């Protein structure tokens, strides 16, 4: 996600430094031409504001890190690729990561730390919970409710629900890659 973060800072004319955080590091190193450090070193960095994009697929680990960041007064950072399409009346909570070629339809509500990988879309009137992960190429059609911590595998297609009976993907559900979901799970 670093290239997307760099694009976003450039688009916003923001000169903030991007650093990579990895608790396995014992000393400052370099990753993809950026300084890399453990979380304690990051906390000790001097900055007027600090934001973190949690680029970890495991939703429960993401949630734990988000809670720790909140306790430490560090804000979640949403990053959005240059070519993402955002339609009317959408709500995107903090900490989301929208990769290239993602589309978010109209009247969509998305919870915090949502990850939408390459070529995924969320169509109209969907509600996506917190810490949901879309692998590449997920097709989430209209009137679908996806609860917290669901994982939707690469190329999965979810059939459109109706306004009075949305299709529901339950909390913590795992939809396998290439799946075609026609009923609530």
Label the model's feature ranges.
Residues 11-29:
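NAD(P)-binding Rossmann-fold cofactor-contacting core
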Residues 1-5:
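Glycine-rich adenosine-cofactor-binding loop
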Residues 7-13, 44:
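Alpha-helix termini
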Residues 79-185:
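Structural signal for interior beta-strand "rungs" in well-ordered beta-sheet cores
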Residues 18, 50-51, 94, 112:
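Conserved acidic residues
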Residues 25-85:
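Phosphate-bearing ligand-interacting subdomains
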Residues 6-7, 22-26, 65-66, 142-145:
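Intrinsically disordered, low-complexity boundary segments flanking structured domains
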């Amino acid at each position: 996600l670093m290239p997307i973060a760099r694009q976003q800072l450039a688009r916003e004319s923001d000169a903030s430094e991007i650093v990579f955080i990895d608790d396995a590091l014992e000393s400052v190193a370099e990753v993809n031409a950026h300084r890399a450090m453990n979380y304690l070193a990051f906390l000790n960095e001097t900055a007027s504001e600090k934001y973190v994009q949690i680029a970890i697929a495991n939703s429960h680990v993401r949630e734990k890190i988000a809670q720790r960041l909140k306790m430490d007064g560090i804000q979640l950072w949403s990053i959005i690729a240059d070519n993402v399409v955002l339609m009317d009346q959408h709500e995107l909570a903090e900490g989301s990561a929208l990769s290239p070629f993602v589309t978010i339809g109209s009247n969509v509500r998305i919870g915090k730390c949502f990850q939408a990988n390459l070529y995924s879309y969320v169509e109209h009137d969907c509600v996506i919970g917190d810490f949901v992960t879309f692998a590449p190429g997920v097709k989430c059609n209209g009137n679908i409710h996806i609860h917290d911590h669901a994982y939707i595998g690469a190329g999965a297609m979810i059939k459109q629900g109706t306004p009075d009976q949305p299709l529901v993907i339950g909390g913590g559900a795992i939809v396998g890659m290439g799946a075609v979901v026609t009923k609530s799970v």
